[in-house]
Amino acid sequence: MGLSRRTFFLGTTAAVGAGAGFFGARLVEYLGAPPEAPCKTLAPEEVETLGALADELIPPDPPAAWNGGRGHPGAREANVVRFLDWHLAPGAALAGDRETYRVHLAKAKGRAAAEVEKDDPKFFDLLLRHVKMGYYGNPRYGGNAGYASYRMLGIAGPGCTGRDVPPGKKAG
């Protein structure tokens, strides 16, 4: 019996889909992160304040010999602000914290993270938790652009297992 049209169609559709997914991911890696879209939930002054605080919490590294002459990006460069903008939008995962951010970022404008921590520890804890989520999370959620934290930690990325630990490093 020969190959039916249905089997042929299903097989070629699956192959084309798998190839598009594989090569599309490689193209994104080659071209780099997409250009940063403007924030839609946060106001420009909130974006600036949040970016400054986030970069104090996870600052960029200066260029270093151990990283091929490059430092690791800080929170702002790793798209943590955009991550938070997306997740604070109405209906998104952190939408319930939107008003908290609006009020407390206005108070924090022009202030150092240490001052915010001292004067407003509850908001500071929330901010720190969310900045870490954006920096260390899976890039598919909008942060950790270019796998910044994964490269810094020397891990393969999402879905890595103990077998993916680089030589000379211990798992766990």
Locate predicted features.
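Glycine-rich, often acidic-flanked micro-motifs
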Residues: D61
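Mature-region segments of soluble proteins
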Residues: A52, A64-G172
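Short, charged, low-complexity loops and linkers
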Residues: G32-A37, I58, V81-A89
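C-terminal segment of N-terminal export signals and the immediately downstream linker at the start
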Residues: G2-T7, G19-E56
